[in-house]
């Protein structure tokens, strides 16, 4: 993992972070292990945790978090790569003849595929179970990796939360930025997300990347067309389109 200080010179970014929580430099952080890059207001703390998927698989996860005054920022990475093994093993203990014991298509032994396909929607639903008012929900992409973004008002104190959920190389990315009532919207954090290839270089795809089993993986921009047999079996550069503040 590496970090460097990056001046925020873009006028749009300055408008997003100006006010009580503004500083001249943020930390540009990258994780080769989790294959992402983004900016934080300070070097993030890193902690390990676990995530229970929609179908009950307990998956390893890592949280990167930082604070700036009363504003809080976090990025959680959930590794869905073990999900096939975990859910297949889970199916072995089901009563004989039940649906979850059948290895037919995407049912039974194949439930892990639906767990991966629905991971973004499931993570999004967890935000909506909080005491919040959702003011905006939109499809989005970062460097042509598809995902979803949310804007929420927290009912308890009227603080604002901007969240984003993406999935790349079977790693679920959950970003969350919360600023107090009256502060500028914390949109710059979720829109700074980028991807890294196996060598740690910035990555942008030539067509839309969809992290799902049986879906062909597109070639990186500038690379040769992908082999049609190269699919995201096993579970699965800035340029995202930010939504309006609602």
Q: What do the predicted segments below correspond to?
A:
Residues 50-160, 233, 240-246:
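Conserved polar/disulfide-associated segments of primarily extracytoplasmic proteins
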Residues 30-32, 39-41, 47, 67, ...:
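A structural detector for beta-sheet-dominated domains
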Residues 21-23:
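Boundary at the C-terminal end of the N-terminal hydrophobic targeting segment
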Residues 1-9:
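Bacterial N-terminal signal peptides that target proteins for export
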Residues 32, 36, 44-45, 96-100, ...:
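Surface-exposed amphipathic alpha-helical segments
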Residues 39-43, 67-70, 145, 166-173:
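Short, solvent-exposed coil/turn segments at beta-strand boundaries
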Residues 37-45, 50-57:
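Non-catalytic extracellular/lumenal accessory regions of secreted precursors
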């Amino acid at each position: 993992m590496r970090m460097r200080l990056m001046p925020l010179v873009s006028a749009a970014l300055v408008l997003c972070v100006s006010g009580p929580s503004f500083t001249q430099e943020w930390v540009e952080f990258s994780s080769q292990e989790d294959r992402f890059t983004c900016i934080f207001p300070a070097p993030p703390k890193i902690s390990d945790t676990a995530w229970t998927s929609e179908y009950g698989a307990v998956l390893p996860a890592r949280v990167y978090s930082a604070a700036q005054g009363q504003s809080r920022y976090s990025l959680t990475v959930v590794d869905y790569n073990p999900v096939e093994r975990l859910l297949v093993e889970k199916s072995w203990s089901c009563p004989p003849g039940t649906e979850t014991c059948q290895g037919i298509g995407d049912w039974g032994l194949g439930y892990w595929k639906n767990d991966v396909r629905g991971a973004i929607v499931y993570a999004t639903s967890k935000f909506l179970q909080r005491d919040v008012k959702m003011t905006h929900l939109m499809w989005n992409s970062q460097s042509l990796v598809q995902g979803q973004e949310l804007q929420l008002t927290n009912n308890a104190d009227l603080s604002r939360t901007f969240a984003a959920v993406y999935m790349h190389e079977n790693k679920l990315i959950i970003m969350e930025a919360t600023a107090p009532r009256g502060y500028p919207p914390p949109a710059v954090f979720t829109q700074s997300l980028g991807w890294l290839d196996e060598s740690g270089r910035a990555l942008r795809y030539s067509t839309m990347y969809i992290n799902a089993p049986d879906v062909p993986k597109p070639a990186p921009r500038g690379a040769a067309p992908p082999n049609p047999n190269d699919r995201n079996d096993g579970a699965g550069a800035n340029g995202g389109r930010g939504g309006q503040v609602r």
